[in-house]
């Protein structure tokens, strides 16, 4: 997994993320314009038009974004920590704490450069549990946030990242390894070369099964002298 780095080079990425939010707002604006220009009767398209106007309003007010992680299970395994043990939990807590504090720090710094999100009000959120944790973890950061605000109403999202993790061949989100080995199916044309039918669904579609080995499990086997050519 990759943590937000507190370095000069990371400022480029902070600005890029902020620019991406602006691009998303522009897309919402384009959708509203398209609906407004639709020749269909206004009464028919009013619900859709008002919905997107509300989305635009809330997006502008909060500039919400979501910074998360994936491959935590692989990270713990690489460090020799067993998922679910107290040692692994304590380490994962520190990772999440670092992620949260640095995300808030980046947003506060961006607010000083480009302005806080429009509805920021330090007094209204002073008793918020998340803000209280940031205040406890870094009092100086909290004091700076009270003065300048922050760029985003929310910054952290821990998503399942299922498809992304399949693509990157890592464990998913903050979850452990699903399985070191499991079977998947792919749809086939039975007349194709080197195929065989392992499963046929109720519509007659035919599938071939194949083994999937967790990518980093294979690397572990290789590092420990196992012959992976026989997998």
Language-model segments: residues:
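Internal maturation/activation junctions in enzymes
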Residues: 11-56, 60, 82-161, 169
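Short alpha-helical "patches" and their helix-cap loops
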Residues: 6-7, 82-94, 174-189
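Residue-level recognition of conserved structural "scaffold" positions that shape functional pockets
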Residues: 73-75, 87, 169, 180
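Contiguous, well-ordered alpha-helical segments that form the cores/surfaces of helical PPI scaffolds
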Residues: 63-78, 163-166
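Catalytic alpha/beta core of large soluble enzyme barrels
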Residues: 1, 17-33, 41, 131, ...
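Single conserved hydrophobic/aromatic residue that forms the stacking wall/gate
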Residues: 2-9, 13
């Amino acid at each position: 997994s990759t943590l937000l780095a507190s370095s000069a080079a990371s400022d480029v990425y902070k600005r890029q993320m902020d620019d991406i939010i602006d691009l998303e707002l522009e897309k919402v604006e384009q959708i509203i314009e398209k609906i407004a220009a639709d020749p269909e009767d206004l009464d028919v398209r009013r619900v859709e038009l008002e919905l997107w106007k509300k989305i635009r309003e809330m997006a502008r007010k909060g500039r919400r974004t979501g910074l998360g992680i994936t491959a935590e299970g692989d990270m713990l395994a690489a460090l020799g920590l067993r998922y679910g043990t107290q040692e692994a939990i304590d380490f994962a807590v520190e990772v999440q704490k670092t992620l949260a504090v640095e995300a808030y720090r980046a947003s506060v710094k961006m607010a000083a450069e480009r302005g806080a999100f429009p509805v920021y009000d330090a007094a209204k959120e002073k008793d918020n549990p998340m803000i209280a944790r940031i205040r406890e973890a870094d009092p100086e950061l909290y004091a700076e946030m009270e003065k300048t605000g922050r760029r985003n109403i929310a910054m952290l999202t821990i998503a399942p990242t299922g498809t992304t993790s399949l693509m990157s061949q890592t464990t998913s989100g903050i979850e452990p390894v699903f399985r070191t080995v499991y079977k998947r199916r792919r749809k086939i044309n039975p007349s194709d070369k080197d195929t065989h039918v392992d499963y046929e669904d109720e519509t007659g579609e035919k599938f071939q099964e194949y083994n999937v080995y967790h990518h980093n499990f294979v690397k572990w086997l290789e590092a420990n002298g196992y012959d992976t050519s026989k997998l």
